[in-house]
Amino acid sequence: MQSILRTIAITAALALPFSALAQSDNGYENANGNAKFLRCGTVQPSELDVLLREEHFLKLKNAKNSGKGKPGGGGGSGGSGGTSPQPAVIDVYFHVIRTDSGQGGVSSQQVNSQMQVLNDAYAGTGFSFILIKTTYSNNDSWYTTTGGGSEAEMKAALREGTADELNIYPHNMGGGLLGWATFPSSYASSPTRDGVVILGASMPGGNADPYNLGDTLTHEVGHWLGLYHTFQGGCNKTGDLVADTASERSAAYGCPVGRDTCRG
């Protein structure tokens, strides 16, 4: 079973700039009308999937808090009160993918800059990230993978650690995608598939302008920790299961002022 750390993670991640980063889950909507990129390719869960995950999350949360008095605040339902989650430091493994000839990979400076962006974004949430190791692999198939067998092969060969460790795979994925991630609930059935895949050019210093500031990883790590998009569930009352984010009927691109798609 996946670790309690990540299934409880949503309780500490409410400060993330996810509304500003919200993009399409299915990867078929262009970011800011820029046909060059399709933004987030993380699989959008069905409402039934969300319900089952929430039930599992609450069971783990109640078990963790059993006998410890007042339960912690936040959680999937975004409730308030209680104690704050304990700070957690997450070990990170970067697996840089290059072509067979060793071309196209990100630099160590980019990796370090990306780690800084990630930690800055999660400051105040109770989570911080420390780079444990960077590996380099030369493989044409992995270098352009958009999923399927080549992704499975890549992760099976490279992934390190348990459910608590974050494995990141920057490469030159095709299809115009900027990245995708697995949710904590996927770990039990597919532990080797766990992790985050991003376009290397989206990291600081990359050429995926205007998406080259490192925010793609921030966004995808939110999914890896258990957060949904702010438009999950549309205008339904529970929405993304976080009470302090307003419901949205659809994804918002950029930072539109005064946007309200769920009136009334």
PLM regions and their residue ranges:
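Propeptide-to-catalytic entry region of secreted or membrane-anchored zinc metalloproteases
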Residues: 23-166, 170-175
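Metzincin-family zinc-dependent endopeptidase catalytic domain
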Residues: 112-258
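Short linear motifs centered on Gly/Pro in flexible linkers and helix caps
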Residues: 21-22, 240
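Bacterial N-terminal signal peptides that target proteins for export
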Residues: 1-9
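N-terminal signal peptide c-region/cleavage motif recognized by signal peptidases
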Residues: 17-19
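Short, intrinsically disordered, charge-balanced linker/junction segments flanking boundaries
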Residues: 260-264
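Repetitive helical segments and hydrophobic/amphipathic motifs
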Residues: 12-15
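A generic, residue-level signal for flexible/boundary positions that often mark functional hotspots
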Residues: 8-10, 100, 192, 236
